[in-house]
Design a protein with these regions (language model features):
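Aromatic- and glycine-rich peptidoglycan recognition patches
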Residues: 116, 124-134, 149, 153-196
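Catalytic cysteine-centered active-site loop
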Residues: 88-139
């Protein structure tokens, strides 16, 4: 005498920082990135926010690239573009200056926008898959990591800039020393993208 239905739902558990990319369009993500990086120009309203320490009180780590590395025209082009985004906040799924970036969105954007490599938008695993493994990394190569969050395969990627340093989209985009125990424990490989 009645109709009944079975509804099967699969839920995916992910960090709250991933929510904006699922519920916002590109214009909204752009505004969200600006808001989060400036705390709406009202950091006094967010005294306990982690963003105060990340973006306002502690600017990204500066690092001077040795001049001899910049004699490589390809690397100089790459790093000139990449440094434009120092301090941009991490936004899961972000892949442009308008939305800000996640790690693979940042690397894909820099490679493609410079015209050095037409990767399109790839994830960290996709960037690894198109790169040639190298044992002696040079500035402009990519550095890959596993286990930085709960996913299979490559979970993080950065641009190797020489002297055991990388430029990557952590939170915010900044230079980072690869000799720390964290990065050493998650290191997977170096790779050279298919430069034009």
């Amino acid at each position: 005498p009645y109709t009944w239905y079975i509804c099967t739902v699969t839920l995916e558990n992910f960090d709250l920082s991933h929510v904006p990319v699922y519920i916002m369009g590109e214009d909204q993500l752009s505004m969200y990135a600006v808001y989060m990086s400036t705390l709406g120009n009202r950091p006094d309203l967010f005294p306990s926010s982690g963003y105060v320490g990340k973006y306002i009180e502690n600017p990204p780590t500066a690092w001077d690239i040795p001049a001899e590395y910049l004699t490589d025209e390809r690397f100089a082009t790459l790093i000139t573009e990449a440094e434009k985004y120092l301090g941009y906040p991490y936004v899961w799924g972000g892949s442009s200056p308008e939305t800000s970036f996640d790690c693979s969105g940042f690397v894909s954007y820099v490679l493609t926008s410079t015209g050095l490599c037409n990767t399109g938008r790839l994830g960290a695993q996709g960037l690894y898959n198109i790169s040639t493994p190298v044992s002696d990394p040079q500035p402009g190569d990519l550095v890959f990591f596993v286990g930085t969050y709960d996913t299979s395969g490559i979970s993080h990627v950065g641009i190797y800039v020489g002297d055991n340093m990388m430029l990557h989209c952590g939170d915010p985009i900044s230079y980072t020393n690869l000799n720390t125990s964290y990065w050493q424990s998650h290191f997977y490989a170096y790779g050279r993208p298919p430069y034009n």
